[in-house]
Design a protein with these regions (language model features):
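Hydrophobic alpha-helical segments
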Residues: 2-196
Length: 196
């Protein structure tokens, strides 16, 4: 899958690579990405391939935070969507909203979050994730009451993993924003220009 233009519709900052274009330092990373990514080497992988050593380390981190994390997948994907919405990251939302729905996150929660609202009717664990991730990313700290609520729902490893998921997907959103990556051709961007 290739993405033709940048998010702004102008020439791409990083032209989309194909597997045939990868040099010897990029090829092993590209092959690993192709095995696990439903968007191939597009999205964040396109700029990551420009720095293959970093890209490999990030891919290892992504693997843990997506498939081996101690945070239940529904909540993990919810945390990713919270970051995607904060950053209005077209690719993050495009890639993860279906995964969140498949993992059992209620469509109403996804829709309200996408609209920029605090979701209503969240389960206790979802409320904890929303409050924790939102507080950490907006105030740059976690208050004692928020931490205490998190400790009632999650163990220490889960709290650390949740923090890492949030931080990782801020980095992914930054990478996507820097490269002006967007959704595949013919697909509707989740966030419209001018929306808050």
């Amino acid at each position: 899958m290739t993405f033709a233009q940048s998010a702004t519709g102008k020439e791409r900052r990083f032209p989309q690579l194909t597997m045939d274009q990868l040099d010897e330092s990029q090829k092993p990373l590209g092959e690993q990405v192709m095995k696990v990514s439903r968007i191939g080497i597009a999205g964040p992988y396109n700029p990551m391939l420009r720095s293959p050593v970093l890209g490999q380390r990030l891919l290892d981190l992504f693997h843990y935070l997506r498939w081996e994390t101690s945070v239940p997948i529904r909540l993990n994907e919810f945390a990713i969507l919270i970051i995607g919405r904060q950053w209005r990251s077209q690719v993050e939302w495009y890639a993860h909203a279906p995964l969140a729905a498949k993992a059992g996150l209620a469509p109403e929660i996804i829709a309200e979050l996408k609209a920029g609202k605090r979701p209503s009717n969240m389960a206790e664990d979802e409320t904890v994730v929303y409050d924790f991730v939102t507080e950490l990313t907006t105030t740059k700290k976690i208050s004692n009451p928020t931490f205490a609520r998190a400790k009632k729902v999650f163990n220490d490893q889960q709290i650390v993993d949740l923090t890492a998921v949030a931080g990782n997907y801020v980095m992914v959103a930054m990478m996507l924003a820097m490269a002006e990556e967007t959704v595949p051709p013919g697909k509707e961007p989740p966030f419209k220009d001018g929306e808050k």
